[in-house]
Amino acid sequence: MNLQDDQTSADLFQVATFYSFTAWPEVTITCLLQDLLSLGDEHQLMGTVLLAEEGVNGTICGSVDGVSALLERLERDLIEGLFELKISWTPEQAFRRFKVRRKAEIVTMGLAGLNPSKTVGTYVDAHEWNDLIDDPDTLLIDTRNDYEIAIGEFKGAINPQTKCFRDFPAWVEQQLRSMVKAKTSARIAMYCTGGIRCEKATSYLIEKGFTNVHHLRGGILRYFEEVSQSESRWQGECFVFDQRVALNHQLSPGVYRLCHACGMPLTPEDQAMNSYRTGVQCRHCVDQFSDTDRIRFAERQRQMEHSSRK
């Protein structure tokens, strides 16, 4: 797999975000666990890869050769055309360690029986997305969590205010069903960071009898790649689950930083507040933890800073 492009530089790390809903037997998962861990160690990769009977989900960071080696090993056991991959670049390593884990689900909704490889909504490519969401008959739904939505979203999107993806089915039954009934001609358009949550969310909706369900192919990250900022309907930055915290429309690290105490994204203004202590507390968690917790957080921050200076 050739992942070189014009941005390739000896000073940049390559970040690959990928997933595939591909049914695997246990023997394949066992082999992949061993092979991917070995490749990660060999190429000094960092990141996380989740494997389950329903497929694979991961984000890894490292050299172009290392990232290519791991992806090529994965593709040997994937069905061609069912691998969603996005590449970006960062001047610093985006992760602190490398993990390959066996999970019940590659994205956790907590419901058995869903199969996005067989039942899924209508894919909408990035260059067609604006037309869909500009239509007043479209119900635009953000399937991400509320702390992700807080730093960026598509204009006019509905925020289900979920804390985790497991909360989404309850919101569908308590809120979305009545919204659709009140708007009989409605089309549903859903989006998430890279597309994986929408695959499962649209599969769930269809299983529950919803129709005219669409989702953004490749998610927000693909939209950033393919739609110019001047034509974009996106507002803000896109939260990502690594040390970059958030990406701007150029797929470069944005202005947000992470509070390592509570995990919330912070603006420069948040970091300038008197209550902020790096790695220990922020405005979101200033009253949330005990003194013992603060001491532990401070020691962890000291160790992180010491490690980064090596």
Swiss-Prot record:
Gene Ontology biological process terms, A to Z: tRNA modification
Reaction equation(s) it catalyzes: uridine(34) in tRNA + AH2 + O2 = 5-hydroxyuridine(34) in tRNA + A + H2O
Keyword S-adenosyl-L-methionine tagged: no
Recorded superkingdom: Bacteria
Domain Rhodanese: 134-232
Family: Belongs to the TrhO family.
Gene name per UniProt: trhO
Any GO molecular function: oxidoreductase activity, acting on paired donors, with incorporation or reduction of molecular oxygen
InterPro entries per the UniProt record, alphabetical: Rhodanese-like_dom, Rhodanese-like_dom_sf, TrhO, TRHO_N
Protein keywords: Oxidoreductase, tRNA processing
Keyword NAD included in the entry's annotation: no
Name used for this protein in its record: tRNA uridine(34) hydroxylase
Task of the protein: Catalyzes oxygen-dependent 5-hydroxyuridine (ho5U) modification at position 34 in tRNAs.
Pfam family, one: Rhodanese
EC number: 1.14.-.-
Active site positions, chain numbering: C192 (cysteine persulfide intermediate)
